[in-house]
Amino acid sequence: VGTGRRAVVAGYLDILRARHAVRLLVGTLVGRLPNATAAIAIVLFVRAEGGSYSLAGALAAVYGVANAVGQPVLGRLVDLHGQPRVQLPAAVLSALAMAVFAFAGTGTAVLAYVAVGAAGLFTPPLEGGLRALWPSVLGEEDQVHTAYAMDAVAQEVMFTVGPLLVTVCVSLWSPQAALLVLNAVGVLGALSVVVSPPSRAWRSAPREAHWLGALRSGGLLALLGAFLFIGMALGSITVASVPYADDHGGDAVYGWLMAALGLGALVGGAVYGARRWAGEPARRLRLLVALLAVCYLPLMLMPGAVSMVLLTVLAGVFLAPCIACAFVLVDVHAPRGTVTEAFSWLVTTFTVGASVGTGLAGPVVEHGGALWGFAVPGAAGFVSLLVLACTGRVLAAPARGAVVAASSENDPNRAVEPRFSSGHQA
């Protein structure tokens, strides 16, 4: 056990020792704080202004939809024009729009909706940009895939810590200050990334002019279809946990359940990224999604609070490994010159899926209770597995003109031949 633990730590330390790695990872996480905290910050601000929960939910939904639309569009612009020219202006515009919302309040509904929508639309695609940078920073395929797992784990930590930071800002100052401070900090994070040498040097490979961009890849479309349902599973758990918590201790239990879900993903991602995996990534993803779906099923037992927390940890274990493995497949299937856009589409699809899952689980819980609410994630997980099974051939074969990790996508000289292929180890 001690040897395995040392191997886990050593694998991640090797990544963090690489030049610029810590700066890029931390800068990206800080830069994404506004996105990770937007929903709760908007709700708390609207309520403090005297607005209704319906208005708060509607504004948060507008932010989410605008963000889902903006990520792939901005990702395509990054591929065309480079990271600094797109990421920093987008971050500034997003922060300014949120500042307009913070100072104008909800008195003029139209202005509030426009400001929140603009903030979501211009959220910079830092997540996709970081994944495009890892090959040029690390160079070795195994390290790139470990970095993807570390990246997935870091995102789980951020989305767990982010809401806590909002509550701290609100308790120290006000909901308005929380909006302003977190978005200002987000701009600093984006600035830290785009002025770094890897970000300034990165150039996308030449791309074929096509209005579909990354979506012309059948393999990427199959992956997006599968992750739409994985997002639905995650979103439905957050809703189904509410009535369960109401019957077993209230808000404190709900907080423990959400923390347990994040803890499971953190542990699973850390262990997954610490070893080298042989075989086809597509086949491994099918196995991981199958395990993810199976681990959702015990939630329907709805035992006491302590046991339920443990089951929720189990439910989260395979989430980060699924995401990390999907990153590898995005590398394989993204058409040349579209890597940032392709990663942004994965983020968008997962986010949209979570929103759909939240919306679907609401009526299910209302009519059938928490039991049927917890049936939704298991069902969504198995539908995701079905999508992967039906598209196995497409996912197993890289698309024509696809870019793999550490290919010319990250070569300033735009060499034609990639340095290695994802087909042997991932």
Task: Show which residues each predicted segment covers.
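Intracellular juxtamembrane helix-capping segments at the cytosolic ends
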Residues: 124-138, 241, 321-334
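C-terminal transmembrane helical hairpin of 12-TM major facilitator-type secondary transporters
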Residues: 282-326
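Helix-to-loop junctions at the C-terminal end of transmembrane segments
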Residues: 70-83, 170, 267-281, 365
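Cytoplasmic helix-loop-helix junction between adjacent transmembrane helices
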Residues: 115-157
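C-terminal ends and interior cores of transmembrane alpha-helices
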Residues: 92-107, 291-303
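Helix-loop boundary and gating motifs at the non-cytosolic
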Residues: 7-66, 214-259
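Hydrophobic core of transmembrane alpha-helices in multi-pass small-molecule transporters
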Residues: 29, 109-126, 228, 308-321
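A late C-terminal transmembrane helix in Major Facilitator Superfamily
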Residues: 337-370
